[in-house]
Protein backbone atom coordinates (compact mmCIF):
# COMPACT_ATOMS: atom_id res chain seq x y z
CA UNK A 1 0.00 0.00 0.00
CA UNK A 2 1.19 3.51 -0.81
CA UNK A 3 -0.38 6.40 1.07
CA UNK A 4 0.01 9.90 -0.37
CA UNK A 5 -0.83 13.07 1.56
CA UNK A 6 -0.86 16.53 0.02
CA UNK A 7 -1.23 19.36 2.52
CA UNK A 8 -0.69 23.09 2.70
CA UNK A 9 2.26 23.17 5.11
CA UNK A 10 3.40 19.55 5.38
CA UNK A 11 2.73 16.64 7.72
CA UNK A 12 4.98 17.87 10.53
CA UNK A 13 5.94 21.16 12.10
CA UNK A 14 4.09 24.00 13.80
CA UNK A 15 1.84 24.74 10.81
CA UNK A 16 0.82 21.17 10.00
CA UNK A 17 -2.90 20.84 9.58
CA UNK A 18 -3.49 24.49 8.75
CA UNK A 19 -5.50 25.03 5.59
CA UNK A 20 -4.03 26.62 2.51
CA UNK A 21 -4.85 27.12 -1.12
CA UNK A 22 -2.89 28.02 -4.21
CA UNK A 23 -3.28 31.83 -3.96
CA UNK A 24 -2.35 31.83 -0.27
CA UNK A 25 0.74 29.76 -0.99
CA UNK A 26 1.71 32.01 -3.91
CA UNK A 27 1.73 34.88 -1.42
CA UNK A 28 3.30 32.96 1.46
CA UNK A 29 6.14 31.50 -0.64
CA UNK A 30 7.01 34.87 -2.18
CA UNK A 31 5.87 34.16 -5.72
CA UNK A 32 3.47 37.09 -5.71
CA UNK A 33 6.29 39.43 -4.62
CA UNK A 34 8.13 38.87 -7.90
CA UNK A 35 5.13 38.67 -10.24
CA UNK A 36 3.90 41.72 -12.12
CA UNK A 37 5.48 45.07 -12.85
CA UNK A 38 7.76 47.15 -10.64
CA UNK A 39 5.75 49.51 -8.45
CA UNK A 40 2.48 47.59 -8.82
CA UNK A 41 0.74 45.54 -6.14
CA UNK A 42 1.68 41.84 -5.84
CA UNK A 43 0.09 39.71 -8.54
CA UNK A 44 -1.17 36.14 -8.36
CA UNK A 45 -0.05 33.90 -11.20
CA UNK A 46 -3.32 33.22 -12.99
CA UNK A 47 -2.83 29.46 -13.28
CA UNK A 48 -2.85 27.28 -10.18
CA UNK A 49 0.81 26.41 -10.51
CA UNK A 50 1.22 25.45 -6.86
CA UNK A 51 -1.76 23.09 -6.83
CA UNK A 52 -0.68 21.50 -10.11
CA UNK A 53 2.99 21.39 -9.14
CA UNK A 54 2.21 19.73 -5.82
CA UNK A 55 0.21 17.11 -7.69
CA UNK A 56 3.16 16.49 -9.99
CA UNK A 57 5.60 16.14 -7.06
CA UNK A 58 3.17 13.76 -5.35
CA UNK A 59 2.88 11.71 -8.54
CA UNK A 60 6.67 11.46 -8.79
CA UNK A 61 6.80 10.38 -5.17
CA UNK A 62 4.15 7.73 -5.78
CA UNK A 63 6.02 6.41 -8.82
CA UNK A 64 9.27 6.24 -6.84
CA UNK A 65 7.40 4.53 -3.99
CA UNK A 66 5.98 1.96 -6.43
CA UNK A 67 9.54 1.04 -7.41
CA UNK A 68 10.50 0.69 -3.76
CA UNK A 69 7.40 -1.39 -2.96
CA UNK A 70 8.27 -3.70 -5.87
CA UNK A 71 11.80 -4.05 -4.53
CA UNK A 72 11.03 -4.47 -0.81
CA UNK A 73 7.37 -5.46 -0.58
CA UNK A 74 6.94 -2.78 2.10
CA UNK A 75 4.30 -0.05 1.87
CA UNK A 76 5.29 3.59 1.90
CA UNK A 77 3.99 7.03 2.77
CA UNK A 78 4.55 9.90 0.34
CA UNK A 79 3.95 13.55 1.11
CA UNK A 80 3.92 16.84 -0.75
CA UNK A 81 3.11 20.28 0.54
CA UNK A 82 1.88 23.36 -1.27
CA UNK A 83 4.39 25.52 0.61
CA UNK A 84 7.35 23.36 -0.41
CA UNK A 85 6.19 23.56 -4.02
CA UNK A 86 5.95 27.35 -3.84
CA UNK A 87 9.35 27.71 -2.21
CA UNK A 88 10.75 25.29 -4.79
CA UNK A 89 9.56 27.54 -7.62
CA UNK A 90 11.48 30.40 -5.96
CA UNK A 91 14.91 28.71 -6.04
CA UNK A 92 16.38 31.01 -8.73
CA UNK A 93 15.34 34.08 -6.74
CA UNK A 94 16.63 32.64 -3.47
CA UNK A 95 19.96 31.65 -5.03
CA UNK A 96 20.34 35.08 -6.62
CA UNK A 97 19.61 36.79 -3.31
CA UNK A 98 22.10 34.59 -1.47
CA UNK A 99 24.78 35.24 -4.10
CA UNK A 100 24.28 39.00 -4.41
CA UNK A 101 22.45 40.13 -1.29
CA UNK A 102 19.96 41.90 -3.55
CA UNK A 103 16.28 41.26 -3.02
CA UNK A 104 14.45 39.99 -6.09
CA UNK A 105 12.18 42.48 -7.77
CA UNK A 106 9.33 42.47 -10.22
CA UNK A 107 10.39 42.57 -13.85
CA UNK A 108 7.12 42.21 -15.71
CA UNK A 109 7.67 39.60 -18.40
CA UNK A 110 11.47 40.02 -18.43
CA UNK A 111 13.97 37.50 -17.15
CA UNK A 112 16.56 39.00 -14.79
CA UNK A 113 19.61 37.22 -16.17
CA UNK A 114 18.92 37.25 -19.91
CA UNK A 115 18.13 39.97 -22.45
CA UNK A 116 16.15 40.23 -24.57
CA UNK A 117 13.79 37.77 -22.92
CA UNK A 118 10.46 39.55 -22.59
CA UNK A 119 7.33 40.89 -24.25
CA UNK A 120 7.50 43.53 -26.97
CA UNK A 121 4.64 45.53 -28.44
CA UNK A 122 3.79 44.62 -32.05
CA UNK A 123 1.48 46.61 -34.30
CA UNK A 124 -1.44 44.33 -33.45
CA UNK A 125 -0.61 42.86 -30.06
CA UNK A 126 2.38 41.46 -28.26
CA UNK A 127 5.28 39.16 -29.11
CA UNK A 128 7.63 37.41 -26.70
CA UNK A 129 11.27 37.43 -27.78
CA UNK A 130 13.53 34.97 -25.98
CA UNK A 131 17.15 35.26 -27.08
CA UNK A 132 18.66 32.99 -24.46
CA UNK A 133 22.23 33.21 -25.75
CA UNK A 134 24.47 35.25 -28.05
CA UNK A 135 23.80 33.06 -31.10
CA UNK A 136 20.05 33.42 -30.70
CA UNK A 137 20.42 37.18 -30.23
CA UNK A 138 22.19 37.41 -33.59
CA UNK A 139 19.40 35.37 -35.20
CA UNK A 140 16.68 37.53 -33.63
CA UNK A 141 18.42 40.68 -34.84
CA UNK A 142 18.70 39.25 -38.34
CA UNK A 143 15.01 38.31 -38.38
CA UNK A 144 14.09 41.84 -37.27
CA UNK A 145 16.46 43.56 -39.73
CA UNK A 146 18.50 44.85 -36.80
CA UNK A 147 21.79 43.22 -37.80
CA UNK A 148 23.77 46.19 -36.47
CA UNK A 149 22.81 45.55 -32.84
CA UNK A 150 25.15 42.59 -32.10
CA UNK A 151 28.10 44.72 -33.27
CA UNK A 152 27.22 47.44 -30.74
CA UNK A 153 29.47 46.84 -27.71
CA UNK A 154 26.51 47.49 -25.38
CA UNK A 155 24.83 44.38 -26.79
CA UNK A 156 27.76 42.12 -27.76
CA UNK A 157 27.26 39.70 -24.86
CA UNK A 158 24.33 38.73 -22.70
CA UNK A 159 25.88 40.40 -19.66
CA UNK A 160 26.16 43.65 -21.61
CA UNK A 161 22.61 43.30 -22.93
CA UNK A 162 21.30 42.81 -19.39
CA UNK A 163 23.23 45.89 -18.26
CA UNK A 164 21.72 47.93 -21.13
CA UNK A 165 18.31 46.21 -21.11
CA UNK A 166 16.23 49.40 -21.19
CA UNK A 167 17.99 50.83 -24.26
CA UNK A 168 17.90 47.45 -26.00
CA UNK A 169 14.19 47.09 -25.30
CA UNK A 170 13.47 50.50 -26.83
CA UNK A 171 15.50 49.69 -29.96
CA UNK A 172 13.86 46.30 -30.49
CA UNK A 173 10.38 47.61 -29.76
CA UNK A 174 10.80 50.44 -32.27
CA UNK A 175 11.06 47.67 -34.84
CA UNK A 176 8.45 45.24 -33.46
CA UNK A 177 5.84 48.02 -33.37
CA UNK A 178 6.10 48.16 -37.19
CA UNK A 179 5.39 44.43 -37.52
CA UNK A 180 2.42 42.25 -36.70
CA UNK A 181 2.85 39.68 -33.96
CA UNK A 182 2.73 36.94 -36.62
CA UNK A 183 5.55 38.55 -38.60
Where are these regions (language model features)?
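Active-site-adjacent "lid/gating" segments in soluble enzymes
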Residues: 1-127, 131-132
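Aromatic-enriched alpha-helical interface/lid elements that frame and gate functional surfaces
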Residues: 115-183
Amino acid sequence: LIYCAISAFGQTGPMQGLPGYDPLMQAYSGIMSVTGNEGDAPVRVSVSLIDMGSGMWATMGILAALREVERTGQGMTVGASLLETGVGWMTVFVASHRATGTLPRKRGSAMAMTAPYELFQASDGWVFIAAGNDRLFVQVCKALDLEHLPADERFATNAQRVQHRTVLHVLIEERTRTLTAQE
